[in-house]
């Protein structure tokens, strides 16, 4: 496995966990300051904010990283810089327009009824500067990632979250005596301050990037015009943006279909709301948390594949693909089994909602499929095929709608039917991606390695199931949960080594600890 993108994956994974931990603590504290009503006012502005970010910059960071990596592979440092300059100009314009639209359109959004809560005015205008700065940092992150440097992105994410939380909590507490609308608006200011802090971090790393004069390499090939670069940037970024829009679209379709079909199945409205919350508000966030590693891998693999693709290094593309899929198996299969076996204590300890066990157990199977989908999407994007994952997601979405409509209305399945529809949706999209990966790289699936992962995780699952239930009357739930989880991961590694699914070379390729295996 290529140690470069492994290192980047580890760095982004650590940053992802840190950011989520800070965010979780912040949400608890902010809820205590604002209360339920204040949080509701604060949340009212976010759909518009996210929509404007989608319009102004979504998909651009990955597109910039692809174009930058291609030029660096050919030692065209000047071309890479031109990509950045043109992208930065475009994003400055779109970000500025979107920011102004949010600020000056706040009154209209409320008076037209698009935002029903008039007290959200301050939250809307407070988020306007964040739109501008987020478009800037998306440009810098994409460019620096094109150099296959993930540390700047990771540090900027942590700094952004820290500043956001400090300002959010401080401003909310200071402005609370002036009323909930002012306090919610103060909390919204944190997004802009955090984004500006991230921009300063990225600016520092930008000036530390290697210059063409310091590399000793020169490029004498053809140079693309600004129009050609802009055209390629849009060609890449638009499909990537559409892919990111598919996720909220799926959530909205769930909202339209699942509650209605649960009612048709005979569930009362209060239970329908409760069951829907178990799936979308509890089970799905756990799946997203369990795939932090593959989400990071999907980001770091894009420039690595683009670099090899630009050099027409077919063996390099195959090796990077095989290496990333190997890591995907190890990052998803054991966590799928862990969440399935430990679903009850997980939802009880985190949410105090033991009834969410069924939805969580079923949805746990999507950890593997989501991880495969994330990484294969990154590979296809690196191969300049960003439209393929979007089409595949569209096809799988149709399947999900059909399954949601049919399975959820079966009384004995209920919310379990919706959970199975979610698994089928992401599983089919992952399978379609794999078919195209086979077409363009020659790699499909290492069945032997996958089987070793499944056997190791299966044996682990049986042993931790027995261990957890044996210790139930001996240890408190939280201690039993932590001990069993650690025990499970250790068992998985040991069994993988015994089955020769893990070896010394795997250890040697790992960042930080690799030197101990050499």
Model-derived regions, located:
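N-terminal membrane topogenesis motif
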Residues: 1-22, 78, 82, 221-247, ...
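Signature of the first transmembrane helix
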Residues: 4-65, 70, 92, 99, ...
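Helix-loop junctions and terminal segments of transmembrane helices
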Residues: 58-73, 284-315, 325
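Short membrane-interface helical motifs at transmembrane helix boundaries
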Residues: 97-116, 334-352
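Alpha-helical transmembrane segments of multi-pass membrane proteins
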Residues: 115-139, 352-376
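Membrane-interface junctions at transmembrane-helix termini in multi-pass inner-membrane proteins
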Residues: 134-156, 365-395
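Membrane-interface helix-loop junctions in multi-pass transport and translocation proteins
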Residues: 151, 162-200, 205, 387, ...
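Membrane-proximal transmembrane or re-entrant/amphipathic helices at the cytosolic face
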Residues: 466-518
